[in-house]
Regions:
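Canonical Rossmann dinucleotide-binding motif of NAD(H)/NADP(H)-dependent dehydrogenases/reductases
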Residues: 3-32
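C-terminal substrate-recognition "lid" of short-chain dehydrogenase/reductases
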Residues: 180, 215-239, 244
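The beta1-alpha1 cofactor-binding region of Rossmann-like NAD(H)/NADP(H)-dependent oxidoreductases
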Residues: 39, 60-72, 103, 217-218
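Catalytic loop of short-chain dehydrogenase/reductase
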Residues: 137-163, 168-177, 189
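Substrate-binding pocket helix/loop in short-chain dehydrogenase/reductase
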Residues: 97-98, 105-110, 196, 204
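Conserved glycine-rich Rossmann-like NAD(P)H-binding loop of the short-chain dehydrogenase/reductase
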Residues: 29-43
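A short, exposed helix-loop element centered on a Lys and neighboring polar residues
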Residues: 121-122, 169
């Protein structure tokens, strides 16, 4: 897809989302970001897009609210005039022993990581269809793509991210006739969570064949490749430095 003068919506404007938005803007894309609480980071991400000469908007959105997803898409279309690319990046990440997981914990993760991806895609597809096509990029996880859990304490997260892979494949089939290509990224060790110790950093590096953390730009490169392609759909691509083979 020729990216010049297209419009994208990215759910999540922190760290990786900001870099993806910047790289899309560098290729001629206007970008809308949603954010939950990180307004300053969203404003900074929008500023980077504007610095590239493209339009940018930010929208505070509670993606756990089912009605908010359609409202977000309509706001993005209203601000940018069209929608060609949807990047479902927003995620809730909770670590808790299974015995302590409540229904509220389950819903908090499933509602944002899986249901919101479905609802945003559902709202975006008609706009893409009217323009002759579009691209949807969902976000899963390298462990979910591996087909088996590797760590305890992440039941809702693992189920949600595995569901994202199934959603991606189902939407790819449903929307192919409309030239809407649907794929997913399954990140591995990209950014260390805040508070990660030096020993923990090294342990991840030692477990990764390429021997390092990837950084935001590696995800942005993957997203650009998927939205640029005209013949990849239904795929979930691991960007994990080979972590899954070790």
């Amino acid at each position: 897809m020729d990216l010049a003068n297209k419009a994208a919506l990215i759910t999540g404007a922190k760290r990786i989302g900001a870099v993806v938005g910047r790289e899309l803007a560098a290729r001629g894309v206007d970008v809308a970001f949603s954010y939950a609480r990180s307004k300053s980071e969203a404003e900074e991400a929008a500023g980077q897009v504007r610095s590239a000469g493209r339009r940018a908007e930010i929208f505070q959105t509670n993606l756990a609210d089912p009605g908010a997803c359609a409202a977000l898409v309509e706001s993005a279309v209203g601000a940018l005039g069209r929608l060609d690319i949807l990047i479902n990046m927003a995620s809730v990440y909770v670590q808790r022993p299974f015995a302590e997981v409540t229904a509220a914990d389950w819903n908090a993760v499933i509602d944002v990581d899986l249901r919101a991806a479905f609802l945003c895609a559902h709202a975006a597809a008609p706009h893409m269809r009217r323009q002759g096509g579009g691209r949807i990029v969902n976000f899963s996880d390298w462990i979910a793509k591996s087909g088996r859990p590797r760590y305890v304490g992440y039941v809702p997260y693992y189920v949600a991210k595995t569901g994202v892979i199934a959603l991606t494949e189902a939407l790819a089939l449903e929307l192919a006739a409309d030239n809407i290509l649907v794929n997913a990224i399954a990140p591995g060790p990209i950014l260390a969570p805040p508070g990660t110790t030096g020993d923990e950093l090294k342990a991840v590096e030692d477990a990764t064949p390429l021997g390092r953390w990837g950084g935001e730009i590696e995800i942005a490169k993957g997203v650009i490749a998927l939205v640029d392609s005209d013949f990849i759909t239904g795929e979930t691509i691991r960007i994990d430095g080979g972590r899954h083979v070790k």
